[in-house]
Amino acid sequence: MAESVAHPSVLNATEEDIKQLLAASCHIGSKNLDVRMENYVWKRRADGVNIINIGKTWEKIVLAARVIATIENPADVCVISARPYGHRAVLKFAAHTGATAIAGRFTPGNFTNYITRTYREPRLIVVTDPRADHQAIKEASYVNIPVIALCDTDSPLAHVDIAIPTNNKGYKSIGLVWWLLAREVLRLRGALSRTAPWDIMVDMYFYRDPEAEREEEAKAVEAEAEAPAVEAAEFEPTAEGAVDPSILAAATAGQVGQSAWDEEGDWNTTGAAQTSDWANTVA
């Protein structure tokens, strides 16, 4: 499925890259097929699911990375994702490459209404899903902003300049494509060597369900509560009103020649101890 492409051999996908794309189900398309996406489909399964050509997926990832790397100011690249599965991916991509991220709802007028506080003038936008991010693509077409999009087999390609064919409905496939794109951009900029592996794990780009995280935290708290408590030191309780001999010994330690505190007798008949006159003492 991974066909040879026209770019230099140094930009070719490695066996590990192809395995990652297959493991993340980037090659699994939908049952529907847009006419413009036919060139990216390898074959159609018996159950009607279209299989995307992984070789062309990698080719478009490299092409998109080369376009992004040509932008002098990284902040002029705007990465957008209205789908929750792409929120974490675009935020991580922006953090690693210096791009501007819009995760969540795209406010209409961001690219066309200069009166709004969120007005931006990017030189390039990258979207996760042309269908979910249609408002951003539509406004970009009004102001001549190039568009790069992650496209499934049923995605509309209107106003999309570079389509990266992939499964844009799974959180693993979305996160992996954004991770590969960020890594390739850093390599083209010279910030990352091609011989050394990237220390950022692909899992950092995957979507995480907040509800699942809360459940894991709750389970951890319950596990700590069920853990056996530390056993207290054993001691023998004394009768009410009695004095523990060990405590009495510690209290009277070093008091040689002094009467016991519980000695019977009339304390009023005993005079106070003689004190020295400190005023007459000469230093």
UniProtKB/Swiss-Prot annotation:
Q: What is its main location?
A: cytoplasm
CDD domains from the UniProt entry: RPS2
Per the record, the similarity remark reads: Belongs to the universal ribosomal protein uS2 family.
Checking PANTHER family in the record gives: 40S RIBOSOMAL PROTEIN SA
Give the organism's phylogenetic lineage: Eukaryota, Fungi, Dikarya, Ascomycota, Taphrinomycotina
The Gene Ontology biological process terms listed for this entry are:
cytoplasmic translation; ribosomal small subunit assembly
What GO molecular function annotation could you give as one example from this UniProt entry? structural constituent of ribosome
Q: What is the role of this chain? A: Required for the assembly and/or stability of the 40S ribosomal subunit. Required for the processing of the 20S rRNA-precursor to mature 18S rRNA in a late step of the maturation of 40S ribosomal subunits.
One annotated Gene Ontology cellular component of this protein: cytosolic small ribosomal subunit
Chain segments carrying region Disordered: 254-283
Keywords annotated in UniProt = Cytoplasm, Ribonucleoprotein, Ribosomal protein
Keyword Cytoplasm recorded: yes
Q: Which organism is it from?
A: Schizosaccharomyces japonicus (strain yFS275 / FY16936) (Fission yeast)
What is the official name of this protein in its record? Answer: Small ribosomal subunit protein uS2B
InterPro entries tied to this protein: Ribosomal_uS2, Ribosomal_uS2_CS, Ribosomal_uS2_euk, Ribosomal_uS2_euk/arc, Ribosomal_uS2_flav_dom_sf
Q: Name one Pfam family in it.
A: Ribosomal_S2
Quaternary structure and partners: Component of the small ribosomal subunit. Mature ribosomes consist of a small (40S) and a large (60S) subunit. The 40S subunit contains about 33 different proteins and 1 molecule of RNA (18S). The 60S subunit contains about 49 different proteins and 3 molecules of RNA (25S, 5.8S and 5S). Interacts with rps21.
